[in-house]
């Protein structure tokens, strides 16, 4: 009933498996390709950077954003409480926090975003965000290292 059939393939199928140069390969290898960092900035451009969790697992005790806001070039800084609406995102189930949260909330992994800082230059934003280890006070929790521990703690 079902027999293999050789169907004629349209011309684009002939390129499958063929070695073809990228359309901008010549520009890349000669150093002439334009990159985002090479483009001039618009007047008034602001730069954002994330302040990241200094702990892999812990409970936030406080976040001192006033210190971050006082850094040179910083326009403002925001934490989870400043997000209007839900602080969750996710491809299917919206259960991943955008920012870690506030006092009493759990830090889930090292480098989890805790706050966002906006500044007049990229360097100023990054310098202020790097203060996370000093401005995010958190109490460390025991690590959860095995699937059995995660199941017992209902951490899925």
Pin down the residues of each PLM region.
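Flexible, low-hydrophobicity surface segments
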Residues: 1-156
